[in-house]
UniProtKB/Swiss-Prot annotation:
One of its GO terms (cellular component) is chromatin silencing complex. It is found in: Nucleus, Nucleolus. The lineage of its organism: Eukaryota, Metazoa, Chordata, Craniata, Vertebrata. Residues 579-638 form a coiled coil. The gene is baz2a. GO terms for molecular function: DNA binding; histone H4K16ac reader activity; RNA binding; zinc ion binding. A zinc finger (PHD-type) spans 1476-1526. This is Bromodomain adjacent to zinc finger domain protein 2A. InterPro entries: BAZ2A/B_Bromo, Bromodomain, Bromodomain-like_sf, Bromodomain_CS, DDT_dom, DNA-bd_dom_sf, Methyl_CpG_DNA-bd, PHD_BAZ2A. Residues 240-262, 352-387, 524-550, 610-653, 884-905, 1013-1063, 1088-1110, 1123-1149, 1549-1587 are annotated as: Disordered. It comes from the Eukaryota.
């Protein structure tokens, strides 16, 4: 079995041809069945070549004179190396056909069905094809193969156990009916499969001992001989067929003969899932054999013939596959299987063949492992030679067996291929859809794969797909392109999720798919071992019967097993081979014995372990029982103990503990009442003074805030921007009127906007990505801004710096002045903020800071001198009290100085101060008197105040000072330039919680708490504390608990300060506490009970605490002692479930409702430390959850104390009122609406004093405000005393005034836009009149009637499109859009286009008309009525003029139209007007009738001043002497056949006026020409008077270079500040703008000079920049373009010169 040469034997047999029997080996006895020899009749002229096989005489084969077998005529093999080469590489002869017969020879008394020989009808490509190839085999019988008795097919079949089953098959003449000569249909395949399965099941339990057989196949013959042996079979002369149909020979296994597949008896080991991929294709493929048709005819007659016939041998894998035998290539490059099961077996159906070598070696019927008996067989000489000389293919095949391709399974039988993702994606490219549905199962994620056909049909299983493919067979999509594995990442993945609408399938994105696939796969270990897994599957799915034993041959190694099979298969063995065979068998038996011994030892060891475990369990149970018994005895022996006596609680100790808890609760309440808290939580506020609103203010709060920002900025930095403070900076009143579009104030606001925007365009300028934006060919930053056009550059500026998108879109069609006042102020504030980032402002700020440091230095020096003088003065007086006073004064002033400069207070050591004073005293002469010292101190004090004011002024210039906020979150601003204190109300959009957080962040550094708490006071005591009663009082720290400032609180001012707290001696007795309460009862009552005077105005009364506020307090109570107070807001809000009940209408709250608490916090009340409670500053008291938790905490403490039965005096009503006061401060009241969205101001110094008194010292915001007001009180009083210089504060509203609230309410953007558009239309009409009065229009044109006086005009807003932006370049010529005839803006656009077309071209100048850019174009006009009549019109135009027209067509606002109108106005040469023409000689403008105008330059000359004198006006065009001398070309002077004489007069030319040929020329009307065209006689040649044609072409090249997309680095000169080191390397810089300037000024006299400058640009670029940089790449591309254009120019110039 292990050799590959048993089929490729060639050569002559060593015996003579006359010998009837072949000599058998000596060691093998001939075996005969029935002691008979069976001979077969010879056919033709052949010798009797009888072959005894196990006692049988083989049929005679034809041989030639040399004793060799005859070969076919159409196939020859010259050498052993060429055997079966035609099966791989050479096509078979077209003459050859397989011969098929229905006869079978009687071998050993048994019948053998006829099978095909090796199929050679296929080409090598078909033979090597896939097992699923649909190769239709036909039944062809040629006359040659049927009639030739010399041709026979010899076929060898190798069983799975290593023995050879030979079936004799010869090609004999047979008559086959036409009905049988057809391909087998699918129904026949199914029938045959059923028959095979039945027979295989019947023969599965039979045991057979097959014997070895050897097949002979000479190399020079095509005749195949199959020898089949059956032990104890009966010779039956009758020809019959077997019930098992044979398969066509389509599968080859020659690559490794040892791995032949197992027989069909083991096919049931595979489950249906593994067979699924092959079923449909295998059934549908037709079979390339006609034996099935012949077998169908004989099935009925053979079922009852021989019941004892052993057909299990027919179930060998060779016949269960659709191949006769395997073949393998000799070379390693082509090692594919020759016959790869292109047709499926009808017997197998959907089954899949086994593949592993271990499975091949097993006995299919489960027979015992016995040594096979070698039968006497004839072996040719050539076969032995090939076996000895060609061992390499075996090794090659062995390596090929180990290295498999992906998707293949080990073995020679084609297994199901695992589809790759590329294959699975293939159906999706042809209309299929693949969806994987993932949902959560009971234990893990589960996936299900669905396929959707192109028609929409859904398929969930392979049979559905196969059925669909069978009905809709396509040329592309096949079964192997499908996979239902949900772990393959192909198609759409959906996950089942819970949504608001219920369970829905959600499409997963690409990032979620890998995680879902991993979840579907689950936790998997190492990769599966395929061989072990298959072995396990076979054991689990094995059929009935005794399990097969391990074969003895499997005990050997692979090499020994191969050698054993080789030796056993040989008929003749040498002595050495026999010895070797015996050794192998002994080795095999020894290993078998060893293995059995190991199994027995393992079995015995297992039994011993089981016995030991049983003994241990028994012993353990006994020990447990023994222990139980001993325990029972011990309990019986012990005497009964008496029940423990319950001790009565010590009432005194309990009472003392209760009193201690009560004092702790009181101490906690008093400490909390002293801590700063949220201003709106304090119930005892004093009413703030009523501040007057800013008079004359009608702007919204946010708008007025922006106005103040703008005015203060202009006053501080207006001079830096070049603004005049007296003229350019408007007052608040003017600014407000301008925002309301009132009279001249609107112009001032627009002028302010123009100046601010112009400054912002220069510095900081537009961002780099917006610097290339151009309007009408000019950069946006270079446009001359005005009131009319400022809206468009403003829009671009806002878009560049990320302004509001809606505002930018609004500015596209609406001007600045049409927007609401608050929008306009927001625009001004936006520009001011951007100007703050300019380098000018930053440098000014740096200078201010430097000056402040200089002033501060001088102030410190002066303060040092004052300190030394005061110290000397105090020492001179020799007064100890004065010295102490001086020390205190110096300390206070030093602290004030540090506070002014925003420095922290530092602790001062008294001894260091004394030493410092002693050192400073040395500088003062001892003879100085006291009066002199006081005078010096007074002088230095004045200088100190001077520097302090300088520092204050500088700091106010840097920033506006915010003094703080009051209880209503109103900001107090100190504005130095306006005077007074401005108060800004809370904006409507601001959230209280956000403001509270902001206030906490701002005031965290300055907010401090009240006096030290009782817990801190107790620290001064020397007595140790009981750690059990008061554990870790300082476990929680707070940044608000270390204040040194004393507050005038009525509750805490007179409280004792140092009383120790111990277990024996209490810190404060009940009587002392009650006596203190009695003394202060009046003050506490006044500050506790809520009255209309003490409660905040417009605030709601105290709400009643809900009874649900104390549920489950243990969830949050431990957090207080463990978590820092700054995190309490987060920690407590997560557990908050408390809510406040609706507010009570009464002023005071019922004590009973407050004291309804639960008992959960009783233990906490006993151990609650006084310092562990967080302060309310850290709580972010704007959130109700924190307040409710605090209420729960304190209410639980009160309830616990009141729950117990008290002894002695009951708590007084005053204490309950204090507790109620504490509860009230935990509730934050809303800010009244009356103090929002408003502005107030303080102008009276007395109002500051009342404000200071009304501020609450415990409010976190008002405390900071009080501090800052006190600090700057003197300066603030001075500011309030200043007279109000702004007219806004003196404004008195009058009915009907435009500055009113009604104007804001009635504000309409469209109405104001309509007025601006109407003014633009009037501007266009005025320009038309100017052109007519200057006589600059074409002859015969006059403007139409004014449209601005029409009454049917109305506003129309166009739809905005991105392509209509005037900054976007367009290439289309026709940009005309729909224009509304009643819209003023559209009418203005039409009129300005008409005006430009009718302005005489010679009166146009830059920027629209450059003579070097003039292009002559022609237009053909077709008459709609007469299509055959066309008119060709020539006109001139420039690129800038074309751009101007396109821009006008895209105008959507008056600002855009103003830009176009201004450029047109600049492009008209107003100085050439006939009203200003004078004579060249006499310099007078009189005698208009005799004044001639030059047709070239429009200069005039009197006829009598001309030399020679002209008596008559000449015919044709007339040119002045200057133009004649400058013009060298005669073509320019050709007469057009008409005279042109224009006199200086304002009278319009009419058709009916008397015409003189010598005076005037008839001009065609404007209607004769297309828009923008002038008469043909007015066309000028390209080129200017001062430039040659060559320089004109240079200008064209320069224009093309400037418009090139890579010309951006060379358009402007390089800025040395931005590019350091440029001037050091580049000595002669050059750029395109410099070249254009030189070209326009006439600095170029020759083209070579122009070329030198151009080359200089490129050489500088190459010298300074690297080739890989962006600038270097741009320079290389631009140089190539320039060289190409210059070459064209040179060629054209050379042609002209020739």
């Amino acid at each position: 079995m292990e050799t590959q040469n048993h089929l490729s034997c060639t050569g002559q047999t060593p015996l003579t041809n006359a010998s009837g029997l072949k000599l058998l080996p000596q060691s093998v006895e001939p075996v005969y069945t029935n002691s008979t020899l069976t001979s077969f009749s010879q056919h033709g002229k052949v010798l009797n070549y009888d072959l005894p096989v196990n006692g049988l005489i083989s049929p005679s084969l034809s041989n030639n004179a040399h004793g060799t077998l005859l070969s076919n005529e159409h196939i020859t093999h010259n050498s052993a190396s060429n055997n079966f080469d035609y099966l791989w590489k050479k096509p078979k002869s077209s003459v050859h056909k397989d011969s098929h017969v229905s006869n079978q020879f009687l071998v050993n008394g048994s019948t053998c069905p006829i099978t095909n020989g090796p199929s050679i009808k296929r080409s090598p490509q078909e033979t090597l094809g896939n097992c699923t190839s649909n190769q239709t085999a036909s039944f062809n019988v040629s006359s040659h193969s049927v009639c030739s008795p010399n041709e026979a097919n010899v076929k060898m079949v190798t069983a799975a156990n290593g023995a050879h089953y030979g079936f004799y098959e010869a090609s004999l003449p047979v008559s086959v009916s036409a009905s049988n000569m057809q391909s087998v249909s699918g129904d026949n395949l199914v029938k045959e499969r059923t028959v095979e399965e039945n027979e295989a099941g019947a023969t599965e339990e039979r045991n057979h001992t097959p014997e070895l057989a050897e097949a002979l196949e000479p190399s020079d013959t095509q005749t195949d001989l199959n020898i089949c042996e059956y032990k104890e079979s009966v010779l039956d002369p009758v020809i019959q067929s077997t019930p098992n149909p044979l398969l066509p020979p389509d599968v080859s296994n020659l690559d490794d003969p040892s791995q032949l597949p197992s027989q069909l008896g083991d096919s049931h080991l595979l489950n249906e899932d593994s067979l699924e991929p092959f079923g449909a294709d295998l059934i549908q493929d037709p079979i390339s054999s006609t034996m099935y048709d012949l077998e169908e005819l004989e099935v009925g007659s053979t079922k009852q013939k021989d019941p004892q016939l052993d057909t299990s041998s027919l179930d060998c894998p060779t016949y269960s596959l659709s191949a006769a035998f395997p073949l393998v290539a000799e070379d390693t490059n082509d090692s594919s299987v020759l016959f790869n099961a292109s047709s499926a077996s009808p017997v197998l159906g959907d089954s899949v063949m086994q593949e592993s070598a271990s499975e091949m070696g097993e006995d299919p019927e489960g027979s015992k492992a016995e040594e096979p008996v070698s039968g006497p067989e004839n072996v040719s000489q050539d076969e032995m030679t090939i076996e000895n000389t060609s061992p390499e293919p075996c090794v090659a095949a062995e390596h090929e067996e180990e290295e498999l391709e992906p998707g293949e399974v080990k073995g020679t039988i084609s297994r199901r291929r695992i589809a790759t993702p590329e294959q699975v994606c293939f159906p999706l490219q042809h209309g299929w859809r693949r969806e994987v549905r993932i949902k959560k199962g009971s234990h893990r994620w589960q996936g299900e794969t669905w396929y959707y056909a192109p028609c929409g049909k859904r398929m969930k299983q392979f049979p559905e797909v196969i059925k669909y493919l069978s009905k809709n067979a396509g040329p592309f999509v096949r079964r192997e392109h499908f996979s239902f594995s949900p772990r393959m990442p192909v198609g759409d993945f959906y996950e089942e999720r819970n949504t608001a609408e219920g369970l829905q399938w959600v499409l997963l994105n690409s990032e979620e798919i890998p995680s879902r696939i991993i979840a579907i796969t689950g936790k998997r270990g190492r990769p599966r071992n395929l061989e072990k897994a298959k072995a396990k599957e076979q054991k689990a799915k094995r059929g009935r019967g005794r399990p097969p034993k391990v074969k003895m041959i499997d005990l050997l190694s692979k090499a020994d097993a191969k050698l054993l099979r080789k030796l056993e298969n040989q008929d003749i063995l040498s002595d050495s081979e026999k010895v070797q065979l015996c050794k192998l068998k002994k080795k095999m038996r020894r290993k078998a014995r060893n293995q059995e011994a190991k199994l027995e030892a393992a079995k015995k060891l297992k039994e011993i372990k089981e016995k030991e475990e049983k003994k241990q369990k028994i012993q353990k149970a006994k020990n447990q029982e023994k222990a139980k018994n001993q325990e029972k005895k011990r309990t019986r022996r012990q005497p009964k103990q008496k029940a423990p006596v319950v001790q009565k609680p010590d009432r005194k100790l309990l009472a003392q503990q209760r009193r201690l808890e009560e004092r702790k609760r009181q101490q906690f309440i008093l400490e909390e009442l002293k801590k700063p808290t949220e201003d709106m939580c304090l119930p005892d506020h004093q009413q703030l003074p009523d501040f007057p609103c800013v008079p004359g203010l009608f702007l919204p709060s946010c708008a007025f805030s922006d106005c103040l920002t703008t005015v203060e900025f202009l006053h501080s930095y207006g001079k830096v921007l070049g603004l005049d403070e007296a003229k350019d900076i408007p007052s608040l009143c003017t600014l407000q009127e301008g925002l309301f579009n009132v009279g001249d104030s609107l112009g001032e606001v627009q002028d302010l906007l123009v100046k601010l925007l112009q400054a912002a365009m220069i510095n900081p300028g537009l961002p780099p990505y917006c610097q290339s934006l151009k309007i009408l060919g000019e950069k946006v930053s270079e446009i001359v801004l005005s009131r009319e056009n400022v809206s468009e550059p403003l829009r671009i500026f806002l878009e560049a710096y990320g302004g509001d998108i809606e505002l930018c879109d609004s500015l596209r069609s609406h001007p600045f002045q049409a927007h609401a006042p608050h929008i306009k102020t927001a625009i001004l504030a936006f520009i001011v903020n951007e100007l703050n980032a300019s380098s000018l402002i930053i440098s000014e700020i740096d200078k201010t800071l430097e000056n402040m440091s200089h002033y501060r230095k001088h102030k410190w020096i002066i303060e040092g001198k004052i300190r030394r003088l005061k110290f000397a003065l105090s020492k001179r007086k020799s007064s100890e009290e004065s010295q102490i006073t001086t020390t205190e004064v110096s300390l206070r002033r030093r602290s004030e100085r540090n506070a002014e400069e925003n420095d922290e207070l530092d602790s001062i050591d008294e001894s260091a101060i004394q030493k410092d004073y002693v050192q400073e005293e040395v500088d003062i002469p001892p003879s100085t008197s006291v009066v002199e010292l006081e005078r010096q101190i007074e002088k230095l004090t004045k200088r100190q105040m001077f520097f302090r004011k300088k520092i204050l002024g500088s700091s106010q210039r840097l920033r506006t000072v915010c003094l703080g906020q009051d209880r209503y979150r109103r900001c107090y601003w100190m504005l130095p330039h306006l005077g007074g204190i401005f108060i800004e109300g809370l904006p409507e959009s601001a959230e209280p919680t956000e403001e509270a957080a902001l206030g906490n962040d701002i005031e965290a550094s300055s907010v401090k708490t009240e006096d030290k708490s009782f817990g801190s006071l107790c620290k001064t005591s020397g007595h140790p504390r009981n750690s059990t009663a008061e554990p870790e009082q300082n476990s929680t720290s707070c940044h608000c608990s270390d204040s040194k400032d004393k507050e005038p609180s009525g509750v805490t001012d007179q409280f004792p300060n140092s009383v120790p707290l111990t277990n024996n001696q209490q810190d404060l007795s009940q009587s002392v506490f009650l006596s203190w309460l009695t003394k202060n009862q009046t003050s506490i009552m006044d500050s506790t009970v809520l009255t209309p005077e003490s409660s905040p105005p417009h605030s709601e009364s105290t709400p009643i605490i809900s009874s649900e506020a104390t549920e489950k307090p243990e969830q949050w109570l431990p957090l207080i002692s463990r978590t820092p107070c700054r995190n309490h807001n987060q920690g407590l809000s997560t557990h908050s479930s408390n809510r406040l009940s609706p507010p009570s209408p009464t002023a005071a709250t019922s004590v009973k409702q407050v004291n309804e608490f639960t008992e959960e916090a009783q233990t906490f009340a006993t151990s609650l430390p006084s310092n562990s409670t967080p302060c309310h500053v850290c709580y972010n008291s704007g959130k109700s959850s924190t307040a409710s938790h605090e209420i729960t905490l304190t209410s639980n403490i009160l309830h616990d104390s009141e729950k117990e039965k008290r002894r002695g005096r009951r708590p007084s009503k005053l204490l309950k009122q204090i507790e109620q006061k504490y509860y009230n401060q935990l509730i934050e009241r809303p800010i009244p609406a009356g103090v929002r969205q408003k502005w107030w101001w303080i102008k009276d110094p007395a109002m500051l004093e009342s404000l200071l008194k009304a501020l609450h010292p415990r409010g976190i915001r008002e405390k900071t405000l009080h501090k800052h007001l006190t600090k700057h009180l003197q300066h603030l009083k001075e500011m309030c005393a200043r007279p109000a210089s702004d007219a806004l504060f003196k404004f008195t509203p009058v009915d009907g005034h435009r500055v009113s609230q009604e104007t804001l309410d009635r504000w309409s953007v469209t109405d104001l836009t309509f007025q601006v558009d109407l003014s633009a239309l009037q501007w266009v009409e005025d320009l038309e009149q100017r052109v007519m009065l200057s006589d600059l229009q074409q002859r015969g044109w006059s403007p139409s009637a004014p449209d601005s006086v029409r009454t049917d005009l109305k506003y129309y807003e166009h739809q905005l499109e991105p392509a209509d932006d005037i900054t976007v370049k367009v290439k289309r010529e026709d940009c005309r859009l729909y224009r509304e005839s009643s819209n003023p803006l559209d009418l203005a656009v039409l009129r300005i286009l008409c005006l430009e077309e009718n302005v005489e071209r010679k009166y146009l100048k830059e920027p629209l008309w450059l003579f070097s850019e003039v292009q002559h174009e022609k237009v053909v006009i077709t008459n709609p009525e007469d299509p055959l009549s066309t008119t060709e019109i020539e006109y001139s135009i420039t690129s800038r003029l074309r751009l101007w027209r396109q821009t006008v067509e895209r105008c959507r606002s008056a600002a855009q139209l103003s830009l176009c109108l201004q450029q047109l106005e600049r492009s008209i040469a107003w100085e050439r007007s006939l009203n200003k023409v004078t004579c060249l000689y006499c310099r007078k403008g009189d005698n208009d009738e005799l004044l001639l105008l030059c047709d070239s330059c429009d200069r005039g000359c009197h006829t009598y001043c001309h030399r020679p004198r002209m008596n008559e006006i000449p015919e044709g065009d007339w040119f002045c002497p200057t133009c004649i001398s400058l013009q060298s070309e005669s073509e320019f002077l050709r007469s057009s056949g008409s005279s042109k004489r224009i006199r200086k007069c304002t009278v319009r030319f009419t058709e009916d006026s008397p015409s003189k040929p010598s005076r005037r020329r008839e001009h065609p009307t404007a209607s004769q020409f297309s828009p923008g065209e002038s008469p043909a006689s007015k066309k000028r040649r390209m080129g200017t008077r001062s430039q040659s044609p060559d320089l004109t072409f240079c200008e064209i090249i320069l224009m093309e270079l400037e418009s090139h997309e890579d010309a951006w680095p060379f358009l402007e000169p390089v800025n040395p500040r931005l590019v350091p080191g440029y001037r050091k390397i580049i000595k002669n810089p050059m750029d395109f703008s410099t070249m254009r300037h030189k070209l326009l000024n006439g600095n170029y006299s020759r083209c070579e000079e122009f070329a030198e400058d151009a080359e200089l640009i490129f050489s500088n670029c190459q010298l300074f920049n690297e080739d890989e940089s962006d600038v270097g790449k741009a320079g290389l591309i631009l140089k190539k373009f320039y060289d190409a254009r210059w070459e064209e120019f040179s060629q054209e110039r050379n042609q002209i010169s020739l």
